Amino acid sequence: MDKVPFTFSGLGKIKLELDNLKKFERPQVIQAISVAREHGDLKENAEYHAAKEKQAFIEGHITELEDVTSRAEVIDLTRLSGKTVTFGTKVNIVDEESDQETNYQIVGPYEANLKEGLISVASPIARALIGKEVGMSVAVTTPGGTKNYEILTIEVPKS
């Protein structure tokens, strides 16, 4: 079984999500199934089928998150030097063509959230940045073509 890298806060969020699914989402969908059953014929009961579909999704998600948390490896960010881009570091880069600056933190695949500036260690841009230092340029191949970025800063987050 492969370990799944997490920041401390990222694993906490996943555990909260799992707890919410087990304590709130699961009981709600079980109740919805029970109510829908009372409406009679299950063959043509759209409410029942929708609730069963939601239950399958929730149970699948619970199984996935239980597996992921059992294989979680929290990376101690206090041990990072900040000299190179690594898992957990925050990096400020600039698009060499448009001069647009972007901030990212390199995190595990289950905590990635582009809106929050959290990118997966497995993403093309993170793979290009890993191991690089401030001032270095990287080329990132995307479906839209190759983009060139310069690393402006590397920071080790407080936690």
In which residue ranges do the predicted regions lie?
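Internal alpha/beta loop-helix hairpins
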Residues: 46-79, 83
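Non-DNA-binding regulatory cores of transcription-related proteins
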Residues: 75-155
